[in-house]
Amino acid sequence: MEFVKLQCNICFSVAEIKNYFMQPIDRLTMIPVLELDTCKHQLCSMCIRKIRKRKKTPCPLCRVESLHFNVYSINRNVVDVIKCSVTSVAQWNKINGNFDAASLASVLFEKSLLDDAEDSNNAANSDDTMLSESQAILKKLQADIAEQTQLNIKRQLDLNKLQQTSVFMQEKLHRIKNDYNNMHKSFKELQLKRISTEKALKSLNDDYAKLAAKNARLSNENKVLSNKNIELIKHKNLLQNEYTTLQSYKCITNSTITTNVTINVD
């Protein structure tokens, strides 16, 4: 990325940051957008100063109050974070006109100025250094590409293995599903058989109850008939005794009559 544009979330001021990664000399970069320490939302220094209330700055996006803000400074591979109090932001100028940032920097930091000629000489003298660094970067990129290629091959092998495992699991799942369907079908059949058996058993129980009731009725009738039979036997015996008595009486009577007739004849 050659450059990036940052924008304040409140006043929408824009700052552009250029990339000096391939330059052989150190490049100092201060990110102009500031970060509130508590909620991490980004504002410009002017907005922080204007919305500050006493020693705190309420974030206009989330209303969280912050006592400090962070400034980020970049120097090649080193990133420094500067934690500042919100009360340390103050307006420096008192005029209404716009400033030329380069002219202002040349005035404020005159002792740190680096002229273009010296910068060009340093750049010319460092061509070999830049070439060697570029070659080192190229070798590193080639090594990274080779490592990434090996990693991609390994991942492809792992992916193929996972695909085979997935196919095996799908086949196993299909078999399990078929077994489940067959078991469900068998369960339905057994359930229907159970219902039929329960109906048949209920019918048998009903028939048994009817037969038991009929048997009880017949037993009662048999008991009544048995009692009647006993009464009839008793009555028969009584009649038999009376008949025997009558027969005996008849024999005695006949014998008496015969005796009387014999006497009369004589």
Curated annotation (Swiss-Prot):
SMART domains: RING. GO terms for cellular component: host cell nucleus. The keyword Zinc-finger applies. Coiled coil: none annotated. Signal peptide: none annotated. Keywords: Host nucleus, Metal-binding, Zinc, Zinc-finger. It is found in: Host nucleus. Plays a role in the proper expression of late and very late genes. This is Zinc finger protein CG30. It comes from Bombyx mori nuclear polyhedrosis virus (BmNPV). The gene is CG30.
